[in-house]
């Protein structure tokens, strides 16, 4: 549960995580980097789908 809260907070601050930030989060949360990367991708996709946008570029 704590991991999820941290990921959500990080996502709120920045939808695109940097490699350096991903590495440090992975260590802090005892996850591997690819798990964090995929979580961010899935979260962005879920938001895009929920907003009904056809073009992801319009999110910027």
Curated annotation (Swiss-Prot):
InterPro entries: Engrailed_Homeobox_TFs, HD, HD_metazoa, Homeobox_CS, Homeodomain-like_sf, HTH_motif. GO terms for molecular function: DNA-binding transcription factor activity, RNA polymerase II-specific; RNA polymerase II cis-regulatory region sequence-specific DNA binding. One of its GO terms (biological process) is regulation of transcription by RNA polymerase II. The keyword Glycosyltransferase does not apply. Residues 1-41 bind DNA. It is found in: Nucleus. Keywords: Developmental protein, DNA-binding, Homeobox, Nucleus. Coiled coil: none annotated. PROSITE patterns: HOMEOBOX_1 (PS00027), HOMEOBOX_2 (PS50071). Gene3D superfamilies: Homeodomain-like (1.10.10.60). One of its GO terms (cellular component) is nucleus. SUPFAM superfamilies: Homeodomain-like. Required for proper formation of the apical ectodermal ridge and correct dorsal-ventral patterning in the limb. Belongs to the engrailed homeobox family. This is Homeobox protein engrailed-1-A. It comes from Xenopus laevis. The lineage of its organism: Eukaryota, Metazoa, Chordata, Craniata, Vertebrata.
